[in-house]
Amino acid sequence: MNPTRGAVGGTDPRPAAVVLLSGGLDSATVLAIANQQGFACHALSFRYGQRHEVELAAARRVASALGVVRHVVVDIDLGVFGGSALTDPTIAVPAAGTAEEIPVTYVPARNTIFLSFGLALAETAGAWDVFIGASSVDYSGYPDCRPEYLAAYQAMANLATKATVSGERTLSVHAPLMHLSKADTIRLGLSLGVDYGLTHSCYDPGPDGRPCGRCDSCSLRERGFTEVGVPDPAGG
Amino acid sequence: MNPTRGAVGGTDPRPAAVVLLSGGLDSATVLAIANQQGFACHALSFRYGQRHEVELAAARRVASALGVVRHVVVDIDLGVFGGSALTDPTIAVPAAGTAEEIPVTYVPARNTIFLSFGLALAETAGAWDVFIGASSVDYSGYPDCRPEYLAAYQAMANLATKATVSGERTLSVHAPLMHLSKADTIRLGLSLGVDYGLTHSCYDPGPDGRPCGRCDSCSLRERGFTEVGVPDPAGG
């Protein structure tokens, strides 16, 4: 409705925050939360060689619908390292529940890389708050979604930048979904007016961008909407 | 001389290490140290919108001369954030000693971003050791070159990846130059056979790639060679 509420370095009186925005259900909810908390949000998305680039179109729709100060898309090539079904076309995306403990959809150091760009953006935007949609409930078992990881990241970040070492303020990494089930996340997002029809969760969409309905991410999403008792407006 | 000592996933019996290689004097020395310690080195360089892209040519020369298992160059666009004289053509590179406490050549979260890609490469290469040329002596005052920062990074990294959370082993971030002056670094590198004529340090080279002779990096390099009492083979 109001995609640009303020200009970079402009007169927006709200404190700036960086929100990692994938275009999925979780990060859309996090953006709504940060907005509701009164932050002027700088959304940050990545084109990282993922199979599901349809995510980025969803991120743009979500950023526009919920309102952000700006939306930065950074190109990074995680594919050069290989090792993940999300970036390596030779590795198949498994069906939900069939994977090993940490599944092949895990991308090495992904959240660490994403948060590090978030840290850079926070410094240049004058933001002291970085939001990420990590959750340790109903998640895929990725190590970089756990609270102890994020606490260690925040400790490191506060030693890392010109802004944080000034001692003036400390940077906070917020994961407001950390202890919410997928259903709780959906309930919260609906209460904040998130249109989940704009979001995309599937790891392995068809050529038309439609969700596969069988990967971990589709499965978690479907279970969430079923538990809430509302249909998934994205038709997942 | 022997640019490819082993193949990825091949029969190289040496443990793998990741070495961040900028093409400068420090990282060339670090690569020589890691080689001498018996590691099979995976060199990692970045094309990050820096003014001094001649660095990358130097990184390729150094990797080839000292010998690496492979040399990965990752494209990342730090320029989208602005805020540094190294990536923003509208900010002048200052002469040495004229800058504020943390100079405008500081790139927001640069080492955090570089190490995070290093962490990803370490995981896919099966490496437990990441080397970086950071030093807290004769340096430009960047917060992400200090030992407390690197210790916090290592703590975070050990919670971040599938490999590190297995509990099998811990990942180490090595900064073997941390407590060395530039002159000590040069002495060590010379004793290991580093050809500093292949390296490039200047933040603001001319169109022909020649060092400016006046930036912080040129100045530190010149003082180092003067202290050692040998000419800079790069003619800096």
Curated annotation (Swiss-Prot), chains A, B:
CDD domains: QueC-like. GO terms for molecular function: ATP binding; ligase activity, forming carbon-nitrogen bonds; zinc ion binding. The keyword Ligase applies. Its EC number is 6.3.4.20. Binds 1 zinc ion per subunit. Pathway: Purine metabolism; 7-cyano-7-deazaguanine biosynthesis. Zn(2+) binds at residues 202, 212, 215, 218. Keywords: ATP-binding, Ligase, Metal-binding, Nucleotide-binding, Queuosine biosynthesis, Zinc. Its cofactor is Zn(2+). ATP binds at residues 21-31. The keyword Metal-binding applies. HAMAP family: QueC (MF_01633). Catalyzes the ATP-dependent conversion of 7-carboxy-7-deazaguanine (CDG) to 7-cyano-7-deazaguanine (preQ(0)). PANTHER family: 7-CYANO-7-DEAZAGUANINE SYNTHASE. This is 7-cyano-7-deazaguanine synthase. It comes from Frankia casuarinae (strain DSM 45818 / CECT 9043 / HFP020203 / CcI3).
